Amino acid sequence: MNLLDYLPGVPDFPKPGILFRDISPLLANPAAFKETIAQLDALAKTFDYTHILGIESRGFIFGSALAHHAHKGFAIARKPNKLPLASHREQYGLEYGSDSLEIQQSTLPTNAKVLLIDDVLATGGTLIAADKLLRSAGFQVSGAITLLEIAVLNGSEQLEKNHIHHKSVLRS
């Protein structure tokens, strides 16, 4: 099964010049979604981790399914002002602007070894911010996995420069 067949590109979304990959067809197809989680799990097994951090918002989908499949804890990194309790925050640059991520202070145990997960690796900014966020809060980051890496944006090189070990199911 070629999972890229279930990730059609949408040109100029959310801004001109961006090719957005729509995950809706992949999620709507039970066999494709099951295969996606199996392949993410195969990558995750190469890391030593106790918890998964899903990055808003599509990282929530893959991260929660993978955490359930792998019997691991799950936490979320959200956009600003979405969490009800005290949180840690990190600002970062995007392919098309800037934003911030937050995690709730009480979500993860102090000895957590965290695997980051998101749907797409573009420039690496989001995963680098999540890594910095967790490390500044005192957690160990085991690495990062994504469903798709957009190779021309050189995100994997940026992750390497920041000492973040990354693996992706697909590259385009």
Swiss-Prot record:
It catalyses: AMP + diphosphate = 5-phospho-alpha-D-ribose 1-diphosphate + adenine. It comes from the Bacteria. It is an enzyme of class 2 (transferase). Pfam families: Pribosyltran (PF00156). Its main location: cytoplasm. GO terms for molecular function: adenine binding; adenine phosphoribosyltransferase activity; AMP binding. Pathway: Purine metabolism; AMP biosynthesis via salvage pathway; AMP from adenine: step 1/1. Homodimer. This is Adenine phosphoribosyltransferase.
